[in-house]
Amino acid sequence: AQALIGAGGDISGANASTHVSFMESHDEERQGYEMIEFGVSSGDYDVQNELIMMERAKMGSAFHFLQPGPKMIWQFGELAYDISINQEGRLGEKPEPWGSEGLGYYEDTYRQYVFDAYSAILELRNENIDALTEGTFSSSLSGSLKQITIDHTDFKMCIIGNFGTETNTITANFPELGDWFDYFTGESMELEFSNVPVDLAPGEFHIYTNNIRGS
């Protein structure tokens, strides 16, 4: 949670093959709640803003699920559920995201964007699980600028993200030259250098792959 609220934090613990790693569980506050309650601000950028919180939830999911090893999603994390664990008491009934008396998450366009991002990220993971398991994994996950690189014969990936609250520049380390694609937008670029400086707004992240999505 420290990383997503904008206070720094190392997220390398998700790279584990001996146990299931997770961002949320039954006995911890939700990431969304932590961001809304304790998020850091800088100028006009405020992690406590609901829309910004949801954008950062997408970024967190990319950096969690695209590290090697088994992963868990705690219920409704894919919708950026942000109700406190202590609402109505620790074991009290919590509002559901659906139904006439629920939170309306499934009718909320922005919550659905989070759901769709989770789905796409997990699709990428599942389609390239051999690469995540057998490929060369490199990462820098302790600062506000974070990066993951996977280098495998059949699949290569570079993920960059700004977990801070101010615009910053990261040097993206691509494992090979040639054509690369932004996973979400499909935008292509031809690399002549493996180390590329990229300006990132706060909360901005990109997943680059050497194959266009769906190919």
Task: Cite the ranges covered by each PLM segment.
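Aromatic- and carboxylate-lined catalytic core of secreted/periplasmic carbohydrate-active enzymes
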Residues: 7, 63, 68, 96-139, ...
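A structural signal for well-ordered alpha-helical scaffolds and beta->alpha junctions
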Residues: 19, 57, 111-118, 173, ...
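Active-site rim elements
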Residues: 42-54, 99-112, 193-196
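Aromatic- and acidic-residue-enriched segments that line the glycan-binding/catalytic groove
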Residues: 88-96
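Solvent-exposed beta-hairpin/edge-strand motifs
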Residues: 173-187
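C-terminal beta-strand-rich structural cap/linker in extracellular carbohydrate-active enzymes
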Residues: 192-215
